[in-house]
Swiss-Prot record:
UniProt-listed InterPro entries: ATP_synth_F1_ATPase_gsu, ATP_synth_F1_gsu, ATP_synth_F1_gsu_CS
UniProt record similarity statement: Belongs to the ATPase gamma chain family.
Record-linked PANTHER family: ATP SYNTHASE GAMMA CHAIN, ATP SYNTHASE SUBUNIT GAMMA, MITOCHONDRIAL
Stated name of the protein: ATP synthase gamma chain
Organism field: Ruthia magnifica subsp. Calyptogena magnifica
Amino acid sequence: MAAGKEIRTQISSIKNTQKITSAMEMVAASKMKKAQDRMLASRPYCEKISNVIGHLAYAHSEFEYSYMNSSEKLQRIGVIIISSDRGLCGGLNTNLFRHILKQVVEYQAKSIEVDICTIGKKATSFFKNLGLNVKSVLTDLGDTPHFDDLLGTIKVMLDEFDADEIQQLSVAYNKFENIITQTPTIMQLVPMVAGESNNINHYWDYIYEPDAQEVLSALLVRYIEALVYQGLIENIACEQSSRMIAMKSATDNASDMVKELKLIYNKARQAAITQEISEIVSGAAAV
């Protein structure tokens, strides 16, 4: 029963792996719930600051802001790409990278260059290996990143926009739809796209300190930072939900493999017993 011993060893190994994937599934489920809570808590902030900016921009249309004015000609754009630091989360990163590369190819076909800022080890290694122009890298943020951790990286790209080195800046991440569905998303940050606020015909106004222009300038930067942070925590929620599903699938597959191997083992054992009985019967008949 040398083959039977090998099968038993294989079953034992698969069961040990199954314990690991099952534990990882439970950990991912717990982290996903926390990430969802952070994601839902931050959404109202982005919505409110967007409304305030829309109000200010409409009420004070005499002010000129580069973040709100489109360039006549695109020569170079910037993309902040958000990915996970770790793997074992299904095709989450692969689907996002494929979506980004499709856009990059379209831009390059129009002779538009692309500068990239990567957040997460997976995006960093992938796009560096492709030879694209990576301007800034940020990794090891963990499962509970702080808002301030992103400010330096975002500033690198905004400084490029202010210097007219890039004429458009976007953020790419996985948008959390539900536990099953995560959508690769590329959202334009600047120049800002006009929203519904511009359709309102009547505005009351705020009292500003020190003045409306300075307040709006500060809010525009903070809004961009908030959108990138929102993208980051949504991507973390997507990562944990994808990992939970991937680990559940791995655990289920391990169970199926164990069942199949047990069936093979039992058949081999039955054949060995049958052979032994046949040999005993043959020996007895010979006597």
